Structure formats: structure tokens, C-alpha cells
Amino acid sequence: MKILVTGGAGFIGSNIVDELIDKKHKVVIVDNLATGNIKNVNKKAKFYKVSVCDKKKIDDIFKKEKIDIVIHHAAQLDVRKSVADPCFDADVNIKGALNILEACKNTKVKKIIFSSSGGTIYGECGLKAPDEKAFANPLSPYGVAKLSVEHYIKAYSALYGLKYTILRYGNVYGPRQDVNGEAGVVAIFIGKMTANKDILFSVTVNS
């Protein structure tokens, strides 16, 4: 199959691309390298340096490549930035996703797999390990955007028959992760430990 991976130069996306190529799939990457790294791009994949916000270029790529499945990882990743500039966050994370969904609809893509959020979707739900049945109550524009896209995907499935899988990742860590990023506490701690640096905890105690 031919699979398009948005955000395929990023930490998670590039690892998915490598696995798909190992499984003998044809892979197309769309990434504007805002947070991705060209060094992560598998040379056996076809690479387009394009933003998901560029509707015309996205449409052209889908028409040209005849995609079977889309794995959508491209996003504005910073929760704090989403609070500081919610309009920009919505432009990338909601409108960008809609550009992908429209291209899927118009070119008869079989399925979309969406990278949602396992932390920000639930807000302060009080559960140690919320599952899919837990109440979604996002408290940041980033979380609101991710949940909104989940609903858009379900709507496109109901309206146009687009199959989907939604993955709510939480505290993902692994190869190629930026240990200096604002997210990814496991990678940050591992990075500090391997560099023999102190790990600082900020603790709030309510009595």
C-alpha cells in the first residue's frame, strides 16, 4: 500500500515511516520541518517539505500520489504556545487536519490514523490512568483542538465512509526524541541522568 505520513520527519512519525518501509510499504512524507528534522527522513520515502496548512499543495500531493492510508502526526506540539496563541494552534491543528480530511475525501483515501493526545484530552479528570471511556475535558487550546479533530474524523466517517483509528498518546519516549523539548518527561529525565545532571521536582501538597 501507499501510505502518507504527515509529520514524518518528527520523533514519532519518522519511527513509523521506518517501520512501514521495513514492511515494504510505499511511503510519502509531508513535513514542513518546523519541529521535524531532515536527518530523520528515511531516504526510501518520498519527501515533500510542505505545511498541512497549505491546502493547494496538500490537494496536489494527494491527487498525484494516490494514497491508500494517511497517518496524521503533523501538529503544533507546544501546549504553552497553544495558550499564548490559540489562533495559530487552531490554524495548524484544526484547519490543517481539515485540509488532510478534505484531501482524503476527494481522493478516496481508505483510512486515516490520527495522533491525538492522551494527556490534554482529559484535563484534570482525577484518574491515574484514564481510558477511552473517561470523560474528555480539555483545559488547553491544544487539547481542545485535538478533541475537535477527533470529532471531525468521526463526522467524515459517518458522512463519507472514511475508516479511522484514533490514538491518544501519553508520555511517549524513544529514539529521536528531543530531550530539550517542553514535553516528554521520561526523555527529559533520562537525558539528565545520562548527563549526570540533577533532576528537579516541583511538588504541590494539598492538606
What function would you assign to each model-found segment?
Residues 1-172:
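N-terminal Rossmann-like NAD(P)+-binding domain of SDR-like oxidoreductases, especially those catalyzing
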Residues 126-128, 154-207:
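NAD(P)-dependent short-chain dehydrogenase/reductase
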